[in-house]
Regions:
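Intrinsic-disorder/low-complexity, polar/charged segments enriched in Ser/Thr/Lys/Arg/Asp/Glu/Gln
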Residues: 6, 108-110, 166
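Structured loops at beta-to-helix junctions and adjacent beta-edge loops in soluble globular domains
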Residues: 40, 44-46, 52, 89, ...
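Non-heme Fe(II)/2-oxoglutarate
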Residues: 1-78
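Short beta-strand-to-loop capping motifs
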Residues: 9-13, 115, 169-171
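Catalytic core of Fe(II)/2-oxoglutarate
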Residues: 122-197
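A residue-level signal for beta-strand positions that form part of recognition/binding surfaces
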Residues: 2, 83, 164
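Catalytic core of non-heme Fe(II) oxygenases with the double-stranded beta-helix
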Residues: 70-146
Length: 197
């Protein structure tokens, strides 16, 4: 029997000035203009990427830099943001059980701030017991900073009438930043493939 207990941790309440920055950006996001979208029968989500690509030299918009600086006050100034985006999951859609597979996911701390009132959106983490995944249901509240353990199996289901939008940032210890962070991690890729079977 093997057991892992991935978690969603409530880290802090988002201060009003940071909340206003994120809400302003969300209000001005044209959902038709996205850098990434994934659309299948049961999975529909869109993302607005603030920066990605070269983890050694990211270009960060000033207002988002303020949000990241606040996140550092919560988790520690030894961290650097290497990916940052808004992520939307439409009403009635889901992310099935999966793990994130890049090297950066194995080294980083993934932070979430829920920005939309999607009351029927649920997050699931899983214990693995005797080769079966046992789900644990979680809710994320508006105005709260969370950390999600995304290298262990997790999923999201939006059963509500509203789209779910979260601000997501990957923070990595500055001394561990290397050029190959955006390459797949072999162990994580193998686990991802097993979950898909």
């Amino acid at each position: 029997m093997s057991i892992c207990v991935p978690a969603i941790k409530d880290l802090a309440t988002v201060p009003n000035d940071i909340w206003q920055i994120l809400q302003h950006d969300l209000d001005n996001w044209d959902h038709q203009n996205v850098q990434y979208s994934y659309d299948q029968a049961f999975i529909r989500h869109k993302a607005k990427l603030y920066f990605t690509g070269d983890p050694l030299n990211p270009s960060i918009p000033d207002d988002i830099s303020n949000v990241i600086d606040w996140c550092k006050t919560v988790i520690g100034n030894e961290y650097t943001a290497i990916r940052c985006f808004l992520n939307l999951i439409e009403s009635g859609h889901e992310f099935p059980i999966h793990v994130d597979t890049l090297k950066l996911h194995c080294l980083s701390r993934r932070l979430h701030i829920p920005l939309s009132n999607a009351e029927e959106c649920f997050y699931y983490t899983y214990d693995k017991i005797d080769e079966q995944y046992i789900p644990h249901e979680h809710k994320m509240k508006l105005g709260t900073l969370y950390e999600l353990d995304n290298i262990n199996p997790h999923s999201v289901i939006n059963r509500g009438k509203n789209s779910r939008v979260n601000f997501i940032v990957d923070m990595i210890p500055t001394n561990q930043i290397t050029a190959n962070l955006l390459m797949p991690d072999i162990e994580q890729r193998n686990l991802f493939n097993k979950l898909r079977k």
